[in-house]
């Protein structure tokens, strides 16, 4: 009986052999993922090829570091150790490292994250913010020692010298780079003096640029209140930061040009154009007013100003006639009424009362006549004043008082600034006009 081993003893012996075998401590395998269903923590599945299958396990801590998602049927290269599980007597592979076969892990991770973020709408054009035409201050998130910041400063200074640049010194590759990029984007968004951000770095391998493919960086750019221009790597390099940014620039110089779409020279040209337009508009307005003034000076109102108030005189005559008629008729009515009352009172032998009413009637009659005369006289005085004011506008009366009107090309002159020596002028006087030539022009304020 002592020659027989128990199942447990055999299993322990085999486990010891597996654990001590140096060839099984670190195994490199290529296989196809099978029976895979993602779990919240540890991952359990099979690796197979055309002739065999082995159970595989990836502990949760390792799975977080491999950087890509496993998929059913995916061919992967793994590094791990073989162990025996004593209760079942089965052996399995404990995977410590894994990467896709035929494609780099970072490339696969990039593609998987790109698909995920695309499905979530991070790269939709409807989320893109427009870049401002004019900026006062630009925030730049990049390394302080690289060529990126020098190219940006040079280009912005050339295109629009007045624009300020605020550098946020940032680690752009290696451990902690993604977190530092996120922190500086958040700092920039807390400032009120920035108009937009440029986020970028120079060229490099996919590993060097990887910080700009991290999901936290993409989310930070997406949530930025400030418009973001991405300039990562060379023209052929593409990162997820480029997809989510409001604009992507192939080079730092191109990013600076996008940040200052209208240069100082363009702005000055635009201002000069607007000034010229305003000047031409003023000239046209002045010419229009001069022509209108010339036409008005030849109108009937200026040549025969008395016609301006002819209608008012006729209306005043009609109103005066109506007033006189009304006063006369009213007086007659009151006189008849008084006579009627006098006769009634006389018939009642109330001589004293009649006498009082007669006195009152005569007093009212005198008051009415006086009021009527005063009203008519007042209206006549106002009419005469209006008539005198209008007559004062008559150029013939002005000339009659000893003044003269100087015309140039049949237009009245109001200033010597419109006269040059040698010009022919016409002087209108009371009894005729003179044709004169200007010999000298002396400016003098009166």
From Swiss-Prot:
Specify the protein name: Exodeoxyribonuclease 7 large subunit
User: Which UniProt keyword terms apply here?
Assistant: Cytoplasm, Exonuclease, Hydrolase, Nuclease
This chain is encoded by the gene named xseA
Q: Which GO terms describe its biological process?
A: DNA catabolic process
Its Gene Ontology molecular function terms?
exodeoxyribonuclease VII activity; nucleic acid binding
Q: What is its EC number?
A: 3.1.11.6
Cite the source lineage. Answer: Bacteria, Bacillati, Bacillota, Bacilli, Lactobacillales
Q: Can you state the subunit structure given in the record?
A: Heterooligomer composed of large and small subunits.
What NCBIfam families does this protein map onto?
xseA
GO cellular component: a single term: cytoplasm
**Alphabetical list of Pfam families matching this protein:** Exonuc_VII_L, tRNA_anti_2
PANTHER family to which the protein is assigned, alphabetical = EXODEOXYRIBONUCLEASE 7 LARGE SUBUNIT
Q: Which residues form the signal peptide?
A: none
Q: What does this protein do?
A: Bidirectionally degrades single-stranded DNA into large acid-insoluble oligonucleotides, which are then degraded further into small acid-soluble oligonucleotides.
Cellular location(s) = Cytoplasm
- CDD domains, from UniProt? ExoVII_LU_OBF
By sequence similarity, the record places it as follows: Belongs to the XseA family.
* Superkingdom, taxonomy of origin: Bacteria
EC class of the enzyme, as a word = hydrolase
Give the reactions, separated by semicolons, that this protein catalyses: Exonucleolytic cleavage in either 5'- to 3'- or 3'- to 5'-direction to yield nucleoside 5'-phosphates
């Amino acid at each position: 009986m002592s020659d027989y081993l128990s199942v447990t003893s055999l299993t322990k012996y085999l486990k010891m052999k597996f654990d001590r075998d140096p060839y099984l401590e670190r195994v490199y395998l290529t296989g196809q993922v099978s029976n895979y269903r993602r779990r919240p923590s540890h991952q359990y599945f099979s690796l197979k090829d055309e002739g065999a299958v082995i159970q595989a396990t990836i502990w949760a801590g390792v799975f977080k570091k491999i950087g890509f998602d496993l998929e059913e049927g995916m061919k992967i290269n793994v590094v791990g150790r073989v162990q025996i599980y004593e209760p079942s007597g089965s052996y399995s592979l404990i995977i410590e490292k894994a990467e896709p076969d035929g494609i780099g892990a970072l490339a696969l991770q990039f593609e998987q994250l790109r698909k995920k973020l695309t499905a979530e709408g991070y790269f939709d054009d409807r989320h893109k913010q427009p870049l401002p035409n004019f900026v006062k201050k630009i925030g730049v998130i990049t390394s302080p020692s690289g060529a990126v910041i020098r190219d940006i400063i040079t280009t912005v200074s050339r295109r629009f010298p007045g624009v300020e640049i605020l550098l946020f010194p940032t680690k752009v590759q290696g451990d902690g780079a993604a977190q530092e990029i996120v922190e500086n984007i958040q700092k920039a968004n807390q400032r009120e003096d920035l108009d937009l951000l440029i986020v970028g770095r120079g060229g490099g391998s996919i590993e060097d640029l990887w910080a700009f493919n991290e999901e936290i960086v993409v989310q930070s750019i997406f949530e930025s209140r400030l418009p973001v221009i991405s300039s990562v790597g060379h023209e052929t390099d593409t990162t997820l930061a480029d997809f989510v940014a409001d604009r992507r620039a192939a080079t730092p110089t191109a990013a600076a040009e996008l940040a200052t779409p209208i240069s100082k020279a363009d702005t000055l040209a635009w201002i000069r154009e607007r000034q010229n337009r305003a000047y031409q508009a003023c000239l046209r307005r002045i010419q229009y007013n001069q022509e209108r003034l010339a036409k008005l000076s030849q109108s009937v109102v200026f040549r025969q100003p008395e016609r301006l108030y002819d209608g008012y005189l006729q209306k005043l005559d009609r109103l005066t006639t109506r007033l006189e008629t009304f006063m006369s008729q009213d007086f007659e009515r009151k006189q008849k009424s008084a006579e009627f009352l006098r006769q009634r009172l006389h018939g009642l032998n109330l001589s004293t009362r009649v006498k009082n009413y007669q006195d009152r009637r005569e007093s009212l009659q005198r008051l009415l006549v006086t009021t009527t005369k005063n009203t008519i006289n007042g209206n006549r005085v106002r009419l005469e004043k209006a008539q005198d004011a209008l007559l004062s506008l008559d150029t013939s009366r002005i000339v009659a008082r000893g003044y003269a009107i100087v015309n140039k090309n049949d237009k009245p002159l109001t200033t010597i600034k419109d006269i040059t020596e040698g010009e022919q002028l016409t002087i209108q006087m009371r009894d005729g006009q003179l044709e004169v030539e200007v010999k000298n022009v002396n400016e003098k304020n009166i």
